[in-house]
Amino acid sequence: MRKLSVTLLSLLAAVSLLLTGCGSSVPGPAPVGSGDTLEGNITISGAFALYPMMTRWAEEFQKIHPNVTFDISGGGAGKGMTDAVSGAVDIGMVSRSIKPEEEAQGAYGVAVVKDAVFPTVNANNPVINEILAQGITQDTFIKIFITGEITTWGEVVGKPEITDEIHVYTRSDACGAAEMWAKFTGDKKQEDLLGVGVNADPGVLDAVIKDPLGIGYNNLGYAYDIANNAPVAGAIVAPIDLNTNSQADTDELFKTMTEAMDAVATGKYPSPPARPLNVVTKGKPTGLTQTFILWILNDGQQFVGEAGYVQLPPEQLAESFAKAR
């Protein structure tokens, strides 16, 4: 045993001298990002619906490719489309379907995730208990947001003696959320929606929270607080009475964000107002932009659920990947 130890020590000493004589050293771990040739800046604008998810994707992508930077701004789906088609940004975030006339201008849309719009009311609404028990039918929403036939909260829940006036809030910026809500309320367009125009998703929610008689609509990630897995404090997601049985069934009442996400994923929540969210480029994406979009559709999908979004069905995800490739 002693002979073996001496021999081993002698061998190690010889190796050490050899390395020293050659001026070599054992290399340490490579710094993060070393050898990474991917670099550049990606500019993105558009839908508030996709904004939180996009910022998360950008953060995670930068951990892998630290020499890539991002400039991300909101502004609504309309701005995202205009900016993408004009070449003002590399990627436009668009929370609605791409129109034929936009495709004719070079808009190239790729679906990346699924989201939905939900009706929101103030938590202190005078008939909140009735709303949560009965739900609100699609026809009632049409009469509130489109025709204006229903103007009091008593009419909503079948109690005409309650005369509190409904205060309707809608989006003032061109956006996918409004377009999807308009499609749900009678296959209409954003400009057909009644109400006081408020800018952006957070703006509508804030208006509803400050007004006990208010009603609006918000994307999933704004209607719910992901940290608490519940509607944002001061607001309630009004159940949609889809089967018109005058009661909010368990598959229509979403007390938690998880329940709402499951309903969107399984198709129990109607589409519209559920829909895919898209990234739009001018022509088929290339270079760094394409690399980022392909990453979103592959490794980037692992962050979708924890960010409060719903993954596309596998077949649609594969279709998007093939389209972006």
Indicate where each model-derived feature is located.
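Exported/periplasmic ABC-transporter solute-binding proteins
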Residues: G23-V85, V94-I98, E103, V110-A111, ...
